[in-house]
Amino acid sequence: MQLTIDTMTYGPDGLAHTPEGKAVFVAGGITGDTVEASFVSDGPSFARAVTERVIEPSPLRADSPCPYSSICGGCPWAGMAYGAQLAAKEENLRSALQRIGKFSGEQIEIMVKPIRRAKNEWGYRNKIELAPSVQNGKIRLGMHGKDPSKIIKVDSCPLFEKKYGKTIKSVAGALGFLANSRDLELERVGIRASRRTGAVEIALWTPTGAFPRGQVARVLQDATKTSSIVRVMTKGEKKARRVAGVEALAGEGSWTEKIGTETMRLSAPSFFQVNTAAAEILIDLVMEALDPEPEEFACDLYCGAGTFTLPLARRCDYVSAVESYGPAVRDLRRNLDIAHLDNVEPIGGDAVREFPEEDADVLVVDPPRAGLAPEAIELIASTSARDVAYVSCDPATLARDLRRFVDEGTFAPVSATPVDLFPQTFHCETVVHLTRVK
């Protein structure tokens, strides 16, 4: 069937409509394309289709510098001009606020601010992950394809920090060589690199048990210039693997990055935004929204290793920082020591169970993709805080949660600023400023 792509979804697909008006999610097309597509599923309210050929290409199309972008799943929007990507991300936020958050067009027009971005649309990632596969009887490392069941062998990735582009090929080659003579049981391999500090860490994710530590360390050190090589040991069922421990095979045993005025050290399992320059925009927006005073008490929920905790502690009298992930809590404590900050209480545990008893003047929440639990919203709404900064990585759960805040009647969103941390993909962060209803 011939279809014209109307807009991009919050996902890799474009959205088109049949002559009868049925929505069709089309893989392989971008806004403005006219395509010949074949249906792969057809439900009562929407269908899915795959582009067979582009009949008339969109003026928004762009040439990708990546030779793998047509088959690799890492940059699904690489074929679209960057300005069009930014416009689509803004529109996805507006759409979610209207459809899910039930905000009016006038409210959205006032609330949503122009999207912010860092300088680089390529070469921005400080982290990349490689997955193992068996090809022609040999172990190969590569990236997940658009078909998630396939691993694409790559020699480089234009999304990764340019200075360290050759590291991918070196690591993949060294481990591929080793894995074909020793059973490394690799689950995945993470590479973190910082242009600012020069730190490069290779993290090997494997099950617990025997492991040729010395041999692996020597081969990787010979093949790459790294500051740290670690093994992250995991256990549990395949779909619910958890970290059992981390051991340093060579070097520092952690990765160091400079963000804003802070220096942070992170263990391999800990989360850190993959786009450091754009993460600094998040920090600026959070601090602008909260505008903390020296005598005030702040609360940082889902604080991770301290991305927002550290700048808050510089400006507030005291900060309670709550994080459920053990490795991140340990990293937070270490980062507080590095920063010589003693006005922060790191609290390990669930954000709801460990919600501080003392009311904070300002709060920042940076929950996972699932958003805030209803109980968390109720607790925040029950405080006497004057302002809340909500950092979200999913517009759908953000819109749902903002509606819940409005329904609670204590806080109302005054601004929502999208920030493009992930160029060439559909993902987008948003910082929302909520203030107490007068």
Cite the ranges covered by each PLM segment.
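Short beta-strand micro-motifs enriched in acidic
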Residues: 38-42, 131-135, 192-196, 437
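Carbohydrate-binding surface patches
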Residues: 190-194, 198-210
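Extended interfacial segments that mediate partner engagement and assembly in macromolecular machines
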Residues: 52-64, 70-184, 196
